[in-house]
UniProtKB/Swiss-Prot annotation:
Keywords: Cell membrane, Membrane, Transmembrane, Transmembrane helix
One GO CC term, this protein: plasma membrane
Xref: NCBIfam families: A_tha_TIGR01569 (TIGR01569)
Subunit structure: Homodimer and heterodimers.
Protein name, entry field: CASP-like protein 1C2
Family named by the database record: Belongs to the Casparian strip membrane proteins (CASP) family.
Cytoplasmic side: 1-7, 75-86, 153-161
Disulfide links within the chain: none
The organism's taxonomic lineage, starting at the top: Eukaryota, Viridiplantae, Streptophyta, Embryophyta, Tracheophyta
Membrane topology summary: Multi-pass membrane protein
Positions on the Extracellular side per record topology: 29-53, 108-131
InterPro entries: CASP/CASPL, CASP_dom, CASPL
Cell compartment(s), UniProt: Cell membrane
Segments traversing the membrane: 8-28, 54-74, 87-107, 132-152
């Protein structure tokens, strides 16, 4: 019974992580807005920022990884590799959200020392999309951290007792 409970919990966490990272990638990849400000055409798009591209790629990889692991048998010799891969994916997602958050902050607040003006007043829909993507990405990172802890606990601690 404990094995079934562990497997169900693992599947639920993986599905949630898959959903969060896939949502983050899709919402960020579809963020786009064009407006005119003082007779200048402004286009805001995720692909104009390397940090946002990195965020989309990292979340797409994280969601594909979670989807693949849903089909991995719960017993086998691959689990030490899965735990190591979970660490890599968790850190990958953490670095991508950190990079994206720093750019989003500059977009929202600007940087008076560098002379960069905030853009969210001119392209609010774009900023709302980015905020939603970052929220989903943060949820994905938290889920991956929980998943990593759960995997370590079930595969290392429970198997030794």
């Amino acid at each position: 019974m404990a094995k079934n409970t562990d497997r169900i919990c693992f599947l639920v966490l993986r599905l949630l992580a898959f959903g969060a990272t896939l949502s983050a990638a899709i919402v960020m990849a579809t963020s786009h807005e064009r407006t005119t400000y003082l007779s200048l055409s402004i286009e805001a798009k995720y692909s104009h920022t390397p940090a946002f591209k990195y965020f989309v790629i990292a979340n797409a990889i994280g969601s594909a990884y979670s989807l693949l692991l849903l089909f991995l048998p719960s017993h086998g010799s691959l689990w030490p590799l899965v735990i190591a891969s979970d660490v890599v994916i968790t850190m990958f997602l953490t670095s991508s959200i950190s990079a994206a958050l720093s750019i989003a902050y500059v977009g929202k607040k600007g940087n008076s020392y560098a002379g960069w003006l905030p853009i969210c007043d001119q392209v609010p829909n774009y900023c709302n999309h980015v905020t939603g993507a970052l929220a989903a990405g943060f949820i994905g990172v938290v889920l991956y951290m929980v998943l990593l802890q759960y995997s370590i606990y079930t595969k290392c601690c429970k198997s030794s007792s």
